[in-house]
Amino acid sequence: TYDIDRPATTLSQLETRHKLRITRPASDTVLEHFTFNRKVDAGKVWANHNDAVGERRFTAEQAQEFALQATRSYVDVHCNVFSDSEFSDMIETLGAAGHISLRVDRMVPTRAPFNEFHVALRKP
């Protein structure tokens, strides 16, 4: 996925977004999305090819402009970034803290040559 270089979403980021009742991607999220966005060939990543990850798709100036746009209107980006294990851990942590009443029911982990995982959540 083009988020390959983006840092994983943290618990504090999720809690802050919840407390602020953010309903659309915030400018910092938009900035990260466009700053770290790269062309990625998932099959080549799994095969450890040197050319699997391309150059960044946007300049710093373009990323800043999208972030500024996000202060005025909706900009479509991935708001949260997790690997399969990070997501599972986050759901467990949020549940243990009493923030959510969901548990992972089933998970299909990321498998070669793909770049996604699938999860079904369940209320206890």
Per-range role (PLM):
Residues T1-R122:
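S-adenosyl-L-methionine-dependent methyltransferase catalytic module, highlighting the catalytic core
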